[in-house]
Amino acid sequence: MKVSLVVVCHHSSRVLSQCVESFRREAAAAVVDAEVVAVEHSEDAAELARVEAIGVDRLLERPNRGYAAGLNSGAAEAGGEVLLLANPDIRFFPGSVSALLDGVERGFDVVGPQFAWDDDGHVLLPAAEDPSPRAEFGRTIRRRSPRVWSATLGRVLDEAWRLWTAEETLPVAGLRGALLTVTRETLSRFGPFDEGYFLYYEETEWLWRARRRGARLGFAAGARVQHRWGHSIGQSDGAADREENSRRRFVARNYGPMWRRILRASGGSSCEPMQVVRLGDETGVPQAENDLWLASQFPHLVPAIGTVRTGAMPAAFLDFCRARGWVMASAKRSDGKWRITGAWTWAGDGV
């Protein structure tokens, strides 16, 4: 079997080498032929040379028409029966490629990994949200209503626990687009990515389209992959506007008039549904009895990054949260029910 890693790059050479090296190592461990196809969007000769020096098998220089266009170009040129469609700011942990391929062999049409924030793979990124209009309405109401938030907290944490503690590939309603594993036949069946999305929501739209046509999406819990998101876009001017424009395009094209009216009517500012203790700038998070540590930029904790039974969050991640005024929360499961045992933030005037 030949497996092609298709990577869309934009001034990404400083992170691409780890992506390529770790992929080749894990492809060898999985005993498959490996190919790396890089689509370079920087339109910069020096950057093109740096990517070429990394040793990719195919280097495609293309004008920057967006991430979806890059994926389509790379997939068309790739020679593998299985394609890993990827951001460059990822690193494969041991066993990850084997676990992704196992998910495909088990009959899932699209398979994604468990993403981790840190080098050790302990701080876990949240699974992708269900993009259906009904699920989006539920999230909107939870953000606005403390009563609904409390009533649905257990279900939200149960799902996080189900995925973060799993070992096999599980069915899910959505996947994160930093790495998607598909066969060439699957990509042909569901069509190319919509190049009307320059950045953000292109994978959401493609997965929603595939799911509505019967695709099975698999979350390969045994495939752990580090994702250092934002290396290229970071906090660049216009990033938030681009994401919002893509979101609006997705809603306009995929939700019917009734759902669009419902979501507009239910929108509004988020609530703070639990007591959050505000800490001094240099104060650490107190110890707490828990099964999950959760961290989110939102007071309602959705979505949340987390760790499972680690005792404490890694210091580097605490510093990350402190610098951004994120909310940290401790959650304990007892007799099948969840409760928040503490919540803290470093934000001075609200979260």
Q: What are these regions, as identified by a protein language model?
A:
Residues 93-127:
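Conserved donor NDP-sugar-binding/catalytic core segment of glycosyltransferases
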Residues 12-27:
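Short, well-formed alpha-helical segments that are part of the catalytic scaffolds
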Residues 22, 38-48:
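A conserved acidic beta->alpha catalytic loop
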Residues 130-172:
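Short, flexible, basic/aromatic active-site loop/helix in glycosyltransferases
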Residues 165-167, 173-191, 195-224:
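A short, conserved alpha-helix in the catalytic core of glycosyltransferases
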Residues 83:
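Short aromatic/hydrophobic "clamp" motif used to bind/position activated sugar donors
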